[in-house]
């Protein structure tokens, strides 16, 4: 089937396996119920997927709805990390119609897998009933600003306030949550202000730098020149001259924040577990491509 719904080209496609071995530092498997993402984030690294899928359409204007063989032996993934939404958002607006992510979660019940859901949506609250049944599950929301105008310039996903409200609801349901401050835009993202808003409703507070490469580098640099001309010299230093001092200073700032609030400060994620409310683990995910290993066992290669 192929049709255009609200300006988005929708295709239904068959796939042999919904699981893909992951090369991410968190390891395990990438699980993407869709190809493409209609949030249309201007900085989305996943836009590179078009090279492999053959899509000619602009990123954010298409969505492939996957159909896969039912997972009949979920125990096969016991103890494995499953990242749902590594190159899509399983809770894109079209999930309300197609329900792929809910179907996936239903098939994973009893797996005893370590499941990480990455999203920018508040639709995840619909599935709290399933999340409770899955046991070791973590839900992560990307929040890199409290400014709705900047957010709207960057993506068409749920508002920041809706994401924060969803995080609170999921956290209070007893499910581990992450505030993923990603990407940190130099001179724009105020991660301390975000921390103040979410520290009582998240277990982990991840920090990741804005990494500009490929086609979206020009998009972002042009945006900065047009909206934040005073930041052009800083972006030139970081992204053309490869000066790392800005993010190195942010690492120091983040570690001091961790000390102030009595929070653990680590280079990578801690093993699954909850932490005392108000003391989330602060994860230094800057330049994460240098981290090898998982669960804070990896070392940085500088």
Cite the ranges covered by each PLM segment:
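Conserved radical SAM core fold
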Residues: 83-92, 122-125, 137-157, 186, ...
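Anion (oxyanion) recognition and catalysis
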Residues: 109, 171-172, 199, 259
């Amino acid at each position: 089937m192929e049709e255009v719904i609200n300006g988005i080209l929708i295709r239904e496609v068959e796939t042999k396996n919904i699981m893909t071995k992951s090369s991410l530092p968190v390891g395990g498997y990438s699980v993407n119920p869709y190809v493409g993402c209609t949030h249309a984030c201007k900085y989305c690294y996943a836009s590179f997927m078009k090279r492999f899928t053959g899509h000619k359409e602009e990123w954010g204007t298409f969505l492939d709805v996957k159909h896969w063989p039912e997972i009949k032996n979920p125990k096969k993934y016991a103890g494995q990390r499953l990242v749902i939404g590594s190159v899509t958002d399983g809770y894109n607006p079209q999930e309300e119609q197609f329900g792929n992510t809910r179907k996936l979660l239903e098939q994973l019940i009893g797996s005893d897998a370590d499941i990480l859901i990455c999203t920018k949506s508040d639709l995840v609250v619909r599935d709290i009933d399933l999340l409770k049944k899955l046991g070791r599950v973590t839900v992560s929301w990307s929040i890199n600003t409290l400014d709705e105008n900047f957010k709207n310039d960057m993506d068409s996903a749920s508002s920041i306030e809706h994401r924060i409200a969803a995080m609170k609801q999921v956290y209070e349901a007893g499910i581990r949550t992450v505030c993923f401050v990603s990407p940190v835009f130099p001179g724009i993202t105020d991660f301390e202000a975000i921390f103040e808003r979410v520290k009582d409703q998240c277990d982990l507070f991840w920090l990741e730098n804005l990494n500009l490469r490929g086609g979206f580098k020009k998009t972002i640099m042009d945006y900065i020149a047009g909206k934040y001309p005073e930041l052009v010299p800083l972006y030139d230093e970081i992204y053309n001259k490869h000066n790392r001092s800005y993010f190195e200073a942010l690492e120091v700032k983040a570690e001091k924040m961790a000390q102030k609030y009595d929070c653990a400060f680590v280079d990578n994620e801690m093993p699954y577990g909850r932490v005392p409310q108000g003391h989330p683990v602060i994860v230094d995910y800057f330049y994460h491509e240098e981290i090898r290993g998982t669960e804070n066992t990896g070392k940085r290669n500088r």
